[in-house]
Every structure is written in structure tokens, then in C-alpha cells.
Amino acid sequence: LRATGLILMKGRGWEYGKRLTCGFIMRVDCIVLGAGVVGVSTALHLQKRGRNTVLVDRRGVSEETSFGNAGLIQREGVYPYGFPHDFGALLRYAMNNTIDAHYHAAAIPKLAPFLFSYWMHSRKVRHEAIARQYATLIEHCVSEHDALASEAGAQHLLRRTGWMKVFRTAREQDARFAEADRWHADFGLNHRKLDAPALRSAEPHLTHDLIGGLHWTDPVSVSDPHGLSMAYLARFEALGGAFLKGEATTLNQSPDGSWTVVAFDGTVITARDVVVCLGPWADLVTQGLGYRFPLAVKRGYHMHYRAEGNAVLNHPVLDHERGYFLAPMLKGVRLTTGAEFATRGAPPTPVQLGRAEPIARQVFPLGERLDAEPWLGNRPCTPDMMPIIGPAPRHKNLTFAFGHAHHGLTLAAVTGRMVAEMVTGEAVFVNPEPFRPARF
């Protein structure tokens, strides 16, 4: 120790050393890169299993994609969002003037290979096969969040109200009702069909122009998605875990097989295992390790509003034909938009919010804006619409957990448990084979 200038101290299960000339060394069992809701859930599950874990992110916890989602734990979401094959829908999206989809024309050449593969995987037979595999994750999404939220004292953030699609035309309503019946038969998903009077009873402050709704009753909504992540973080830290700010691209594997990451304060974190939960930024690490995953981002925007007068929104609501979503949050009514196809880091273009706001005001009495500017987030997407979860094919003690697209919040607790079971050598409670990184 004198020769190396290292002073070792014991933390709560981890070794923390101070090298007199070059900062701190922190020895732990696991490093989790990325402190979105997937990363926080993974770190918590590892810490619960006695693996001393450090969570690392360049920003605060859940300050990127996980901050601004629609707040749904989508128990009904067995079919991941596919690329449309209907010619009318494709023509409508090509006009680039809708709320549910928008694209940067300059980005299309770069995105074209991804979009073509996405389109191919969205063909009916293939999409149905994907849904059967995806459902093995989705079926546990509520129960796994319930378990973590109970431990973290965050059950008050979970609302058991489900969510609603509301309709303007009988054609769309009939089609979605028939689809819901098929999903109930195939996957046991529960719903209520609402005619106009039933919808007005459930949501008296929505416009009476709507003809009905589909109420998915199994999902859970979250009144403060960022608050849920912070509760999971607090539980993780109470069990002895640590969160440090640092740059994931400093990840390096030593000759002895251990992994190191350097925090912004100079701390060198070293561990046997590392888990990459970097969402849309995963490629910044994986490409340097020789992996070329076909990732793309779907961007999304949100804005909060005060409800006018005594108006109350009782459920999260999707205006199906218009393509925007209203969710009651602690901060106000959150208006979210559909997907924007652009390159990661391109300047914000919140045109979808601009299109949605006047229509949403006709549906529900929104008051003043509560945010200084629109929020922008990036959803990490794979062309087969399934996340990448599992051990890296060519590196020991490296595990991937990213690519959850629209279902990062939904699948965070499920993914965290799966990864922790993989790392600790337990039997994995969901068959991980369909989600293995090696499929790409």
C-alpha cells in the first residue's frame, strides 16, 4: 500500500480508496451505465441481491428520456408500435403534417436502412410473432413495478385507473373494439367499451363531440415518472448503492478482465460486471467495443398545462384519430406527441406540439402553459421493436439492456430483474432468448 500510495476505506459493502496523486479508486461488484428508469431499476435489483453497485450517468437520475414520457405502465402493450402498411396512412405521413408522426427530410437517407427493416418486421405475420414474444415481458410489467414501488414507498405514484382511447368516427371505433376483443382472446387483456354517455360519465370534461372510447383497465399510470425513478434511487442508496456522475465513454476493460469507468470528480470505479443501460446513447459505448446494433431514435415532445376552472382529467387519454396524448400529472396535464424521426442531437422542431395544442384545447379545457419551453426526449428503437437484453456476445461480464422504444418505463422493472438474475447466475424468470444481443 505504501508503494502505491493507496489508502483503502470501507464503504457500505464497497472499497473506497484514495490514491494520493490521482484521486479516488472505488471497487464494487457492478457498474450500471445510464441512470434512466431502466438503469435505476437494474441497479436496485442488483443491490437487492447483494451486488455492491454504482450507478453512473453524465446527468442526474432520469433527466433524459425517462423524464418526459406519458407515464404509462402498459399492461395492454403486447403489440409494440409497428410501421404502418396501410397505403392511406403512409401517404398521410409522407405529407409530414400530422401530430402522430413527423420527420426531418435531411435525416431520411441515414435512417432509410432502419426504416426499411422496421417496415419489414411490421408485416402482419411477423408482427404477430413478435407480439407473442414481447408479451412475455409485458405480462409482468405491472407486478414488477408494484414490487419495486412497494419497497421504495412509491405506491402513491401509481394510479389504478387504466387509460383510454377516445374516438371521433364509428369506423375507427369499431376497428379498435374488434382489435381489443382479439387481444382479450389471445392475451387475456381486459377492457371496457364506452359509448358516448359512458365516456361522458367517466370523463365529464371532455368534449361531447367524441362518440365513445376504449378503456384499457389493466395498465397503471404514473403521476410523476421522474419521482418514481427518484424513489427507486433512494431505495437503492438506502441499501448501500451509490450514484456518481461520469461519462460512460470512459468505460475500459483491464487486462485482468475487470471494467473501469472514470467519474467527473476523478473517481476511478472498477468492477467485475458492467451493465449498459444507456438508451438512445448506447451506441456511444457499444460501437467502441465492436458492436454495431441497428439503433435509431424516435423523438417525442411534451408540455404541461393548467386545467381551466374546475376541470379534471380522470384518466390518461389518447385522441386516437389525431395522435396526441393527455395525461394527468402532479405537475399538470401533460400533452405528449407521437414520433419524430430525426438524427440524435438534431435541433428541436416541436411542430407536433404546435399542431396538437389547439386541437387538444377543443377536447379538454387546457389553461396556460406551465413549462418555459417544450421538452424533447429520444426513444431508443430497434427495427424488430424488441429491446436488447442479455450478455454481450464477445465480452465477459458485460450485459446490455437498452432499446425499449416506447416502453422504457413499462419494462424497466422487468428488465432490471432479468439483468440482475443474469449477472448473479439465477434462473431468469422470463425466457431471455428472443431479446438476446446476438440476434443482431
Where are these regions (language model features)?
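N-terminal Rossmann-like FAD-binding beta1-loop-alpha1 element of flavoenzymes
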Residues: 29-54
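Glycine-rich FAD pyrophosphate-binding loop
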Residues: 48-67
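Rossmann-like flavin
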Residues: 112-231
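A conserved beta-strand/loop element that lines the FAD pocket in flavoprotein oxidoreductases
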Residues: 237-248
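C-terminal catalytic lobe of FAD-dependent flavoproteins
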Residues: 321, 365-440
